[in-house]
Design a protein with these regions (language model features):
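Short, solvent-exposed secondary-structure junction/capping segments
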Residues: 6-10, 22-35
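Amphipathic alpha-helical repeat elements characteristic of tetratricopeptide repeat
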Residues: 2-3
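A structural signal for alpha-helix termini and helix-coil/disorder junctions
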Residues: 11-14, 49
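A beta-strand edge to alpha-helix "cap/lid" segment located at domain peripheries
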Residues: 41-108
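Short helix-adjacent coil turns
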Residues: 15-19
Length: 108
């Protein structure tokens, strides 16, 4: 697993926005089917409003072109909500950082 992927995952696990952003490539896009798409510049505001997030992740798969793909599973409890949401995310990364994360909710 590349250092940018490790940093990205560690950032989510420790609720460290700066760590997440430094792991992202300039063209980073976070795609949430409920809340919309956020580029790297917009992501900080989105992240600050998330509430409590817990993640687990799988090993990264190295692709032929040198990029990495991995899955993250998450539990999210929005601020002020009584129940948590569950979901997964597909993350794509290259040598220059994480390029995208596309999330899907199982329960919302």
């Amino acid at each position: 697993m590349s250092s940018c992927v490790e940093r990205y995952v560690r950032g989510w696990m420790t609720d460290d926005l700066d760590m997440i952003l430094t792991a992202c490539a300039d063209d980073f896009v976070y795609d949430d089917p409920i809340d919309g798409r956020f580029n790297k510049a917009e992501f900080a505001d989105y992240f600050r409003g998330l509430g409590e997030v817990e993640i687990a992740w799988s090993e990264a798969v190295q692709e032929a072109d040198g990029k990495e793909t991995f899955w993250m599973w998450w539990t999210w409890k929005p601020k002020g909500a009584a129940e948590s949401s569950l979901g997964a995310a597909l993350v794509k990364a290259g040598p220059d950082g994480v390029h995208s994360e596309k999330v899907a909710s199982y329960k919302h």
